[in-house]
Structures are given as structure tokens and as C-alpha cells.
């Protein structure tokens, strides 16, 4: 199982990957320089990836301003918590603001709403 990262860092990593994917797709268009239509398609897809990355960065920036900032009990640095449970950005200490989850084993499923029957 992969180690869990903080949600903000996960989304930022996705946005960074979109930028690199966009550049790689645009460079892929160079291989088709004899066909202007294919070059146009590859360049457009690359630019759309970069625009998508910009949108994701703007969205996580807005989300980050609304996140609750807490001091990590382990490393004593300030970190942001999204949802009921999250990890410290610096030391990967599990954090929660829900008193009913204190002392329980960290599980990402605590952030999902359960359906009551």
C-alpha cells in the first residue's frame, strides 16, 4: 500500500503532472510536422492540459485558504487539514479535528460520508 500524503500535496502533484503531460504532448506534435492538422491537434491538447493545470492550481489555492490550520503535535509545524482526517505535510502524522476519531487508527475512509439506512 502506498504511503498516504496530505490532500493538498496530492492535488498539487496532480496539477504539476498535468503541466509535464501538456509539454510532452506538445513535443509529440513535432514528430508530425509534415501534417499540420496533427500538429494542431497535439498543440491544442497540450495547451488544454496546461490550462487544466492552471484551473486545478487555482481551485486548490481557493480550497487551501478555507482549510483549517493546525499545529502538528509531532513536529510542531503549522499544517492545513482538509476533511475529518488528514496527514501533516511535513512528518505524515495523522491529524483529525473530530474528537470521536482521536486515538483510532488512521483510515482515509473517515472522510467519506456514509449512507444511513
Swiss-Prot record:
Membrane-related topology note: Multi-pass membrane protein
Transmembrane segments annotated in the record for this chain: 13-33, 37-57
Cell compartments where the protein resides: Cell membrane
One Pfam family, short name: DUF2614
Coiled-coil regions, chain positions: none
Keywords: Cell membrane, Membrane, Transmembrane, Transmembrane helix
GO CC, alphabetical: plasma membrane
Record-stated family: Belongs to the UPF0295 family.
NCBIfam families listed in its UniProt record: PRK02935.1
Protein name: UPF0295 protein Bsph_0336
Species annotation: Lysinibacillus sphaericus (strain C3-41)
Amino acid at each position: 500500500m502506498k504511503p498516504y500524503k496530505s490532500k493538498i500535496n496530492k492535488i498539487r502533484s496532480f496539477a504539476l503532472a498535468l503541466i509535464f503531460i501538456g509539454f510532452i504532448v506538445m513535443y509529440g506534435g513535432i514528430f508530425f510536422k509534415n501534417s499540420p492538422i496533427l500538429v494542431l491537434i497535439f498543440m491544442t491538447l497540450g495547451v488544454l492540459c496546461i490550462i487544466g493545470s492552471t484551473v486545478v492550481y487555482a481551485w486548490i489555492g481557493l480550497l487551501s485558504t478555507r482549510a483549517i490550520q493546525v499545529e502538528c503535535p509531532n513536529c510542531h509545524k503549522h499544517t492545513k487539514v482538509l476533511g475529518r482526517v488528514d496527514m501533516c505535510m511535513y512528518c505524515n502524522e495523522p491529524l483529525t479535528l473530530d474528537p470521536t476519531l482521536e486515538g483510532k487508527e488512521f483510515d482515509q475512509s473517515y472522510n467519506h460520508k456514509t449512507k444511513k439506512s
